[in-house]
């Protein structure tokens, strides 16, 4: 957990005022900008237990084992060096076996699907080995790095607002002139996700830059989608960070005005994936759904039968 969490909250309202700051993560900004603003807000203020989904369990397990895989690699540099030497000799099968020995086996209800993701990660890393000379070239300089930062955001009509940014970056690798951020995604890939992924990485690059960590400038960012056999590594662009900051300012303004829009017409399909429809202004019969969720007496909207 972030060291600054006690002084901030995702469920900030104007009544809280200066007692706490607005807290923002990559996920909250992404949900606000690319999915449903109201769902984001309800997920922070309603005491509703989110449903367990297989894809969330798979993602969590694969992330945990991938983190351990790189920890094991750092603890066994001789294995990494052996794999690098074999990569230069074209012994891909041996490279795979060496790296695979460092990766914890998948287990549990979704073991087969999780193992498919993990085996792809090893095959992808075999390709990376061919560009390495020593273990330090292969291993990340940061593995599941936890970041916090306090920044001031200029909000139209409200001036500068101090907020708390949170972030956990899957992996950070060294480049010639700085570092590259790399995310692991166990979901599906589609080209329409490219702007979204750039936005996520821009957020991480910004948080890393303004945090206390000194890993160097972010020169590249990328992502790996094992399920889709897809990965990218792109040059980091300032324009993406500028666009992300504008979305961040809009999110903060929504907090200040307590104004989180429901999905627009034509995007109602998103509601089928929501655990908070009973509290949503688009569907609820209550004028005070959040208060009802927290035990208050219901106030019905005009025209609704009690």
Give the residues covered by each predicted segment.
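Metal-dependent nuclease catalytic regions and adjoining charged, substrate-binding loops involved
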Residues: 24-25, 112, 191-194, 209-306
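A residue-level signal for conserved active-site and pocket-lining positions in enzyme catalytic cores
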Residues: 36, 62-63, 171, 204, ...
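A non-catalytic, helix-rich entry segment at domain boundaries
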Residues: 5, 65-153
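Extreme N-terminal basic, low-complexity initiation segments
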Residues: 1-3
């Amino acid at each position: 957990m972030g060291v600054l969490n006690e002084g901030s909250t995702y469920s900030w309202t104007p009544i809280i005022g200066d007692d706490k700051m607005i807290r923002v993560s990559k996920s909250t900004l992404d949900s606000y900008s690319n999915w449903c603003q109201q769902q984001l807000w309800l997920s922070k203020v309603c005491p509703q237990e989110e449903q367990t989904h297989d894809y969330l369990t798979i993602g969590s397990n694969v992330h945990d084992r991938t983190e351990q895989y790189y920890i094991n690699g750092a603890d066994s540099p001789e294995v990494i060096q052996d794999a690098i030497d074999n990569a230069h000799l074209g012994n891909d099968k041996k490279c795979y076996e060496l790296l695979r020995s460092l990766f914890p086996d998948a287990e549990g209800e979704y073991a087969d699907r999780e193992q498919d993701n993990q085996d792809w990660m090893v095959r992808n890393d075999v390709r990376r080995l061919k560009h390495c000379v020593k273990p330090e070239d292969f291993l990340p300089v940061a593995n599941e790095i936890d970041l916090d930062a306090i920044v001031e955001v200029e909000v139209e009509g409200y001036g500068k607002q101090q907020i708390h940014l949170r972030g956990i970056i899957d992996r950070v690798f060294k480049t010639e002139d700085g570092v590259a951020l790399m995310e692991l995604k166990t979901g599906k890939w589609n080209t329409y996700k490219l702007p979204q992924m750039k936005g996520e990485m821009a957020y991480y690059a910004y948080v890393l830059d303004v945090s206390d960590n000194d890993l160097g400038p972010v020169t590249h960012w990328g992502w790996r989608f094992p399920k889709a056999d897809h990965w990218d590594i792109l040059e980091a662009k300032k324009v993406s960070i500028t666009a992300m900051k504008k979305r961040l300012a809009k999110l903060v303004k929504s907090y200040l005005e307590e104004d989180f829009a429901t999905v627009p017409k034509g995007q109602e399909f998103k509601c089928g994936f929501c655990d908070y429809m009973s509290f949503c202004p688009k569907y609820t019969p209550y004028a005070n759904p959040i208060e009802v969720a927290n035990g208050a007496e219901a106030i019905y909207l005009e025209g609704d039968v009690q």
